[in-house]
Amino acid sequence: MADDIDIEAMLEAPYKKDENKLSSANGHEERSKKRKKSKSRSRSHERKRSKSKERKRSRDRERKKSKSRERKRSRSKERRRSRSRSRDRRFRGRYRSPYSGPKFNSAIRGKIGLPHSIKLSRRRSRSKSPFRKDKSPVREPIDNLTPEERDARTVFCMQLAARIRPRDLEEFFSTVGKVRDVRMISDRNSRRSKGIAYVEFVDVSSVPLAIGLTGQRVLGVPIIVQASQAEKNRAAAMANNLQKGSAGPMRLYVGSLHFNITEDMLRGIFEPFGRIESIQLMMDSETGRSKGYGFITFSDSECAKKALEQLNGFELAGRPMKVGHVTERTDASSASSFLDSDELERTGIDLGTTGRLQLMARLAEGTGLQIPPAAQQALQMSGSLAFGAVADLQTRLSQQTEASALAAAASVQPLATQCFQLSNMFNPQTEEEVGWDTEIKDDVIEECNKHGGVIHIYVDKNSAQGNVYVKCPSIAAAIAAVNALHGRWFAGKMITAAYVPLPTYHNLFPDSMTATQLLVPSRR
C-alpha cells in the first residue's frame, strides 16, 4: 500500500511541479495585482489627502481672511467708539448738562444711556459756540409808530395803471427814499386794482420829494401823488351837529371833487373807515362828466363820523375835498330844508342857483371860510328871488369863481422835471469883472453836486432877472437841488427856483439832449 502510494506520488510529481509553478505564478500575479491595487489605493488616498489638505488650506485662508476682516471691523468700530467717546468727552467738557439728579448705574443703564428727556434738556441747554455766526437781528415791526407818524410818512397815489403791482410802485418811489410799505386798494369782489394806493416811506423827508413826482408816467400812465394826512377840521359846531350815539347807516355829502374822480376812487378812499352801502356820484346828463359832488352812505354812523373828521379838507387831485353830513340842520339855515327832504334821499339832488348858494353856505359853516358877499346877500333875501336878480347874482358869482380859479392856477407849481431855472443869481448891469459868468456857473455846479450833480448848465448873461438854467441827471437830483436852493440868499438876493418842462428845455438848449456826463467846476 505504501509502495503504491509512493509510485502514485512519483507519477504525480511532475504534474504537481507544474501545478506549483502555475500556483506560484498565479500567486505572484495575485501578489502583483494586490500590490498594484494597494498602490492605486495609496495613490487615491494620497490624492484624497491632497484634496482634503487643499480644502483645509482654502478653509483656513478664508477663516483667516474673515478673521482679519472682523478684526478690521472691530478696530474701525473701536476707533469710531473712541472718536465718539472723545467727542462726547469734549462735548461734556464744553457743555455741562443742567441735569443735577443722581447718576445712573452702568449695570442699570447698560447700553441705553441717559433718558430721552435728559438728552433733550442737554440739547436745549447748549450755549452758543464762539465760532458760530449769530442769527440775523429780528426785524422790528412797523407798528411801533403811532398812526399820526405813519400818516406823516405816507402818500396817496391815484390814476394808476390797471396792471401795476406793488413792486412797480416801490421801484418808482425808491428814487426819492426808502419805501416801507405799499398798499394797493382793490375791489373786494373782483380783486382788481381800483387805480389807487398808499405808499409809506421810512423817512418823513421823502414825502415832499414823492409829491414832486406827480405827472411822471408809471407803466405809461401819469401818476397823481398827494399827501395822505387830511387837514383835520374838528370845529365844535361841526361836532355838535353830528348825531351822537346814533346807530345805523349815515349818508355823507362829498363835494369839490375833480371831474376825473370816479366812484371806484371814492370807494378806495372812504372804504378804509368802514363798510359802504352805496356811492352815488352825480353826473351831467349832457356831457356825461361828473358834476364834482356825490353822496356816500356808510353802514355804521361811527364809521361815517370818522371819515368826516379825517377827510374833510383832504386835498384830492389838487382840490380840497368837502365832506358834510346830509341830514344836519342849523338854526340859521332854515331855507336849506329841502336838502334834507325824503325826495332828496330817494331821487338825489339837482342843484340850481339857489341850491348852490345854500350848499355853499352850509359847507362854509364851521370851516372858517367866507362865501362871496353876493351870495350872502342872496341868502338874506326872503323865500324867492326875481329872475333878473338871480341872473345878476349868477353873473357876479361866475366872475368871482373865474378870478379864484385863475389865482389858484397861478399858485399851482409845475410838475417836477430834471430841469429847473434859478432867478436872482446876478445883476448884469453891475457885473463888470471878466469871467463873472464862469464863477456863477462854478458856484451852481458845486452846490448841485451835493445833491446828485449837473449834466448841463447855462448862464443867461443878458437876462435882467439873472437866470441860470440847470439840467440834472435825474428828477430826484433836481428835486433835491431845488429844495436846497429855493429861498436861499445869494449876493444879497433871494434865489427863486422853478421847474422847466423837459421839452421846453431841449428846445432852448438842443445840445442838452445828448448830455450825460456830470460837470465839475472849472476852477481847481
From Swiss-Prot:
Residues 355-400 are annotated as: Interaction with ESR1 and ESR2. The modification Phosphoserine is found at residues 97, 100, 117, 121, 136, 334, 337, 341. Residues 14-32, 131-146 have a biased composition (Basic and acidic residues). One of its GO terms (biological process) is mRNA processing. Residues 1-146 are annotated as: Disordered. Pfam families: RBM39linker, RRM_1. Residues 153-230, 250-328, 439-502 form the RRM domain. It comes from the Eukaryota. SMART domains: RRM, RRM_1. One of its GO terms (cellular component) is protein-containing complex. It is found in: Nucleus speckle. There is a cross-link at residues 111, 119, 244 (Glycyl lysine isopeptide (Lys-Gly) (interchain with G-Cter in SUMO2)). The modification Phosphothreonine is found at residue 146. Residues 291-355 are annotated as: Activating domain. Residues 291-400 are annotated as: Interaction with JUN. Residues 33-56, 64-95, 119-130 have a biased composition (Basic residues). The modification Phosphotyrosine is found at residue 95. Residues 400-524 are annotated as: Interaction with NCOA6. The modification N-acetylalanine is found at residue 2. Keywords: Acetylation, Activator, Isopeptide bond, mRNA processing, mRNA splicing, Nucleus, Phosphoprotein, Repeat, RNA-binding, Transcription, Transcription regulation, Ubl conjugation. GO terms for molecular function: RNA binding; RS domain binding. Belongs to the splicing factor SR family. Interacts with NCOA6 and JUN. Interacts with ESR1 and ESR2, in the presence of estradiol (E2). Interacts with RSRC1 (via Arg/Ser-rich domain). Interacts with SF3B1. Interacts with ZNF106 (via N-terminus). PANTHER family: SPLICING FACTOR (PAD-1), PUTATIVE (AFU_ORTHOLOGUE AFUA_1G15810)-RELATED (PTHR48036). RNA-binding protein that acts as a pre-mRNA splicing factor. Acts by promoting exon inclusion via regulation of exon cassette splicing. Also acts as a transcriptional coactivator for steroid nuclear receptors ESR1/ER-alpha and ESR2/ER-beta, and JUN/AP-1, independently of the pre-mRNA splicing factor activity. This is RNA-binding protein 39.
